[in-house]
Amino acid sequence: MLYQTLRTSENYSSILRHRLSTNPSTAAEPWTILIYQDGVDPSDGLAKQHSRKTVVFYWSFLDLGPAALAHEQVWFTVTVARYNVVMEVPGEHATLTSMVLDQFVGDDGTNYFADGASFQLFDGSSVLIYARVNAILADEPALKEMIACNIV
C-alpha cells in the first residue's frame, strides 16, 4: 500500500520527502510507525442491534508530524473486521491486535523496516525508510480491548 501510494500520489510523496529532509530516517534513528485502532458504527445510534459495528486498524508514520496526521489521507487501513466476528475469536481484540502487529514483522520476528525499505516516489526519485512500530493510539476502551486487561 505504501509502495503504491508513494509511486502514484504526488501529495503524499511531497509530504514524505519534506519530512525526510527535516527529520531523516536512519538505522540509528528510525521513524516511528503509529498504529491507530478505532471502532466504527455506521448504524443508527438509536438502533437496538449494531450488527454493522466494525473494528478498524490504521497505521502511519508518527514522524510525518501532527499537521499531516490530522488528515486521513496519510493513514493506511491495515484491516477492518466486524465487531461481532472479533468477539467470537479466542482472545478477541488482543488476538486481532497481535495479527495487525504481525503485518510489520516477518515470521522470524524481523522488522521489515529495520534494514531500511526502499521506495520510489512520484517524481521517480528513491528514498530509504527505516522505521519500527513504537506507538499505539486509541481511546481507553480500545486500549483495554487491545491489551486484554482491565483499566481502572
What name fits each language-model region?
Residues M1-S14:
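Low-complexity, highly charged intrinsically disordered N-terminal segments
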